[in-house]
């Protein structure tokens, strides 16, 4: 597996064409989504003070985020994009995480988000309409 992952590092345009490579790509995509969200979401930590137990938040609280937008080759070409995207959401095995608890999963299959950010500076309504049309909706996740 290590050799195949190393090969993928230098062949970033490769789209899996067999079950083994699809499984490796799936695992890498899940890990990437989980890592990316972990870097953005904060956490709650128990701290003991002279007044007793309290919680300290570090980072951003994303628990109430309504939408998670995913993009990238491993996600837009995957057979199980929705399953991979769920790694962005709260997981009970990490109760201190401040990841989104419930969110609608959206997929940017055409890589338009950056362009829409630029377009929105002059034409916000046009950018919004294009995004609503082009970004795929996977529904509400829990």
Which residue stretches match the model-derived regions?
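Helical "lid/coupling" subdomains associated with nucleotide-phosphate turnover
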Residues: 1-142
